[in-house]
UniProtKB/Swiss-Prot annotation:
MF (Gene Ontology): ATP binding; DNA binding; DNA topoisomerase type II (double strand cut, ATP-hydrolyzing) activity
Keyword terms, alphabetized: Cell cycle, Cell division, DNA-binding, Mitosis
Comp. bias (Basic and acidic residues): 1-26
Species in which this protein is naturally found: Caenorhabditis elegans
All copies of domain Topo IIA-type catalytic, residue ranges: 314-783
Gene behind the chain: cin-4
This protein's name: DNA topoisomerase-like protein cin-4
One CC-aspect GO term: nucleus
Keyword Ribonucleoprotein: no
Mutant phenotype after disruption: RNAi-mediated knockdown leads to impaired removal of the cohesin component scc-1 from kinetochores on mitotic metaphase chromosomes.
Length: 842
């Protein structure tokens, strides 16, 4: 253990301000061991806790109330004498860099200390100290997701920070439950990690005969399954084994702010190792398998914390999406019904279509986020919000329940993610099911359009929004071989100013104007400053008077809407002149903020975490990935058109041969007809064959091994393996000629033959046109289509504003409303349109 950790209390004293504060912290600890506790809601205390048998007792600490219900079901098996249960309902603090007051104010941390009987002044290195505890074990029960891993990680960090000696006594344990189960008849096989399940599938020939069930969380298990887990505690209780300095280093590396640089280097090495295993076709390493009885702290943080936190927190450069967002987009593209759907129902569809194995609550939040369009959220929302999806009043937190709002794929989304590209993406496979791609490839870098925020382990990312029109111009410059122009952050409908301070910093200003000697009007706030927060934290604070000084403001009135900001602020007499002499109004009223571009971290196309220095650098790397996809798209489309032309030509030949009685269909077996077709050199269905070839290519590239028997045989032919399987693969399928023999009698005519020949020639003409096009031409066409759709949306918005202005104008003319009430109710943009309209009529 490092010197820093040995002297933990010294460092805490320095942060807290002295031994007095340390004494205050110790006041939160129990004075003596007691068998009965009061005042801790939802605690199911073990009957023997705090008694002479306390060392045999285990406290089950659960992640939330649903997990507590599962644990209580298990108590019917193990009994209540030696087991207690307590649900932890909030996120535990990272105690590495907190001061004493922050730790002392955590009610749930204090509850854990009281339940266990811990004291900050004891190290629990001796048997006498250990016997003062109310429980001899702490058993953590959390979900199999990134939140569950974080919950466990923060708990381990907490105990390691204050009582590292407890790990030497195997005090902390992990209760694991199956993440998946395979059932066939009475046989059940449980899996505690997805890599373990994948390995079983590879080694089990008849795995398809099993029924597979995934457990999205602890709440998914039934009471019967919970009791079964508790009946085999040896299998399900995993010790956190202390392994010396390596474990100390791993914990500090994961949580200490002083280890940021070292943590970054360490995590980079771990990711390199993981990617190398993937490239070599090796199975993914996992923490839990059927042989696991203990894990070291180092292994836990390497496998559970490092990859999951970063993967789910930081988006990919190519599509700007995190895994959950990508699954939502995949499901929206795949759904046959493109009409609006309830968010809760869409979350269920996403879980089914994309093999999502965690709780649907987070999916609903992801869907809501993708549809939000208030100022400071998205420049282009990929989903249409139909209902209350949140506003700038509370930064989206005021969205309605997912059961009562609807979402729909935005029309502009498909112009950003063209359907033709779906054929050249690298899709992932799970349970022999094709799910979302490793990344989509939009026509402009969406990570810059909508920005990104996220905090992982060792990295955090914060990318501002940029103007999609300017990004289109930069892409066209790159296509033309010209240098990019520097970009400044831009947010849709933001009426303030964004001014560059230096290459990596921009000042963001709200809008404030003086109405008279004692009144100002605030009509815009800095980006990410929400209206409700501003009122509570800034304006209400300025209304408070300080020593011998009058308050800055005496009153304010609110006239904002869900989309606009409007505070009319009354200042104390003479305050305006005083402020103007000393400070800028933007500074006094906190109407300025800084936008940094120094923390732009993303996964690149190869899955590596990288730091980017500018939006132009991101655009350049995106450009390289996108260019490759256009080349692949052209190749794919040429293959499709050529196969379709060949198919039409074969059908025309077939009709002609039938008309000329060279092929007789009446009273003949299908096998005999197919034999004749083969002798006459008719092709097996060219389109079907081409699609099968593309499918096999995709499956091989994805590493998916669970193909149909015929597909495996086809692969064997190409790779020279297993001659018996290869022989089966080349055996002609009768169905390959259905496109000929299945033609309706009415189509066996001269007119139909001529029609097919014409269609074939048209396909070949399309081939010739496409062959002449370059990847640059394809890209520019997509960009122009996108800009056309974007312009249509803007015109529709203007039309909506004009209609609103017209309604107000009519109401004023009819004297149903007054000018002053209109000014208080409508947005500045609508008022401007109304003023123009009124001027044109005067």
């Amino acid at each position: 253990m490092s010197e820093e950790d040995r002297n933990v209390f010294t460092s805490i004293d320095k942060k807290g301000g002295g031994s007095k504060q340390m004494d205050d912290l110790n006041q939160k600890c129990p004075k003596r061991k007691t068998s009965k506790l009061k005042g801790i809601p939802k605690l199911e205390d073990a009957n023997d806790a705090g008694t002479k048998n306390s060392q045999q007792c285990t406290l089950i600490l659960t992640e939330g109330d649903s997990a507590k219900t599962l644990a209580v079901s298990g108590l019917s098996v193990v009994g209540r004498d030696k087991y207690g249960v307590f649900p932890f309902r909030r996120k535990l603090l990272n105690v590495c860099d907190l001061n004493v007051n922050q730790i002392a104010d955590s009610a749930e941390v204090n509850a854990i200390i009281k339940i266990l009987g811990l004291q900050y002044t004891k190290k629990y290195e001796t048997e006498d100290d250990f016997k003062t505890l109310r429980y001899g074990k702490l058993l953590i029960m959390a979900n199999h997701d990134s939140d569950g891993s974080q919950f466990k990680g923060l708990l381990l960090n907490f105990f390691h920070r204050f009582w590292p000696a407890l790990f030497k006594r195997d005090f902390v344990e992990d209760f694991i439950t199956p993440i998946a189960k395979a059932t066939e008849g009475k046989e059940e096989v449980s899996f505690y990690s997805l890599p373990e399940y994948s390995e079983w599938r590879m080694n089990t020939d008849n795995w398809k005969s099993y029924t597979i069930k995934y457990y999205n969380g602890l709440g998914t298990l039934t009471s019967k399954e919970a009791k079964k887990c508790f009946s085999d505690m040896v299998r399900h209780r995993i010790r956190f084994k202390y392994n010396g300095a390596d474990d100390d280093k791993a914990v500090n590396m994961a949580f200490s702010k002083k280890k940021i640089e070292a943590r970054t280097d360490y995590l980079m090495k771990l990711m390199q190792d993981k990617n190398q295993r993937k490239q070599q076709g090796l199975a993914e390493e996992c923490l839990y398998n059927k042989e696991t009885r203990f894990v070291t702290l180092k292994d836990f943080f390497n496998y559970e914390i490092v990859c999951s936190w970063n993967l789910h927190s930081i988006p990919c450069l190519v599509d700007g999406l995190k895994p959950g967002q990508r699954k939502v987009l995949f499901a929206c593209f795949k759904r046959a019904n493109k009409r609006e759907v309830k968010v809760a129902q869409l979350a269920g569809a996403v879980a089914e279509i994309s093999a999502y194995h965690h709780g649907e609550q987070s999916l609903m939040g992801t869907i809501v986020n993708l549809a939000q369009d208030y100022v400071g959220s998205h420049n282009i929302n990929l989903l249409l919000p139909i209902g209350q999806f949140g506003t700038r009043l509370q930064g989206g937190k005021d969205s309605a329940s997912a059961r009562s709002i609807f979402a729909q794929l935005s029309q502009v989304t498909r112009t950003l993610f063209p359907a033709h590209d779906d054929n050249v993406l690298r899709f992932l496979y799970e349970e022999n099911q094709r799910i979302e791609p490793e990344w989509y490839c939009p026509i402009i870098p969406m990570v810059l359009v909508n920005g990104a925020q996220g905090t992982g382990t060792g990295w955090s990312t914060n990318i501002p929004n940029y103007n999609p029109r300017e990004l289109v111009k930069n892409i066209k410059r790159l296509i033309a071989g010209e240098p990019q122009k520097a970009l400044a952050p831009w947010y849709k409908n933001f009426r303030g100013k964004i001014i560059q301070i230096d290459p990596s910093r921009f000042a963001c200003y709200g809008e404030v104007s003086v109405l008279d000697d004692n009144t100002i009007e605030i009509t815009e706030l800095p980006i990410k400053q929400w209206t409700q927060d501003y009122k509570e934290k800034v304006l209400e604070g300025l209304m408070e008077s300080s020593d011998k000084k009058s308050p800055v403001i005496v009153d304010y009135k609110e006239y904002h809407t869900d989309t606009t900001v409007k505070f009319v602020v009354k200042l104390s007499p003479g305050k305006l002149r005083e402020l103007e002499r000393g400070q800028d109004l933007h500074q006094v009223f906190k109407l300025q903020a800084v936008i940094n571009t120094t923390c732009m971290v993303l996964f690149d196309a190869a899955g590596w975490l990288r730091t980017y220095t500018s939006p132009e650098a991101i655009t350049q790397e995106f450009y390289d990935s996108r260019q490759e996809k256009y080349v692949q798209r052209k190749e794919y489309l040429l293959g499709v058109l050529q196969a379709q032309s060949k198919r039409l030509t074969n059908q025309a030949r077939f009709i002609l041969a039938t008309i000329n009685n060279k092929i007789v269909l009446e009273n003949k077996k299908k096998t005999a007809i197919v034999d004749v077709l083969i002798k006459m050199k008719f092709d097996a269905d060219p389109v079907k064959k081409w699609k099968e070839d593309q499918k096999l290519k995709e499956l091989r590239e994805s590493g998916e091994i669970e193909l149909d028997e015929d597909d495996l045989a086809a692969v064997a032919v190409e790779e020279g393996e297993d001659i018996s399987s290869a022989a089966k693969a080349v055996e002609t399928k009768l169905s390959d000629y259905d496109y000929l023999v299945g033609l309706a009698l009415i189509k066996l005519s001269e007119e139909e033959k001529n029609k097919l020949i014409k269609e074939s020639e048209e396909k070949m003409a399309e081939v010739r046109v496409l062959e002449k096009k370059t990847w640059q031409d394809l890209w520019i066409t997509d960009l122009d289509n996108f800009m056309s759709e974007l312009t249509s949306r803007r015109l529709a918005r203007k039309l909506s504003l004009r209609r609103t202005a017209t309604r107000w104008y009519a109401m004023i003319c009819q004297r149903r409303v007054t000018w002053s009430s209109m000014k208080e109710s409508i947005s500045i943009r609508t008022m401007t349109v109304w003023s123009v309209r009124m001027s044109s009529r005067s």
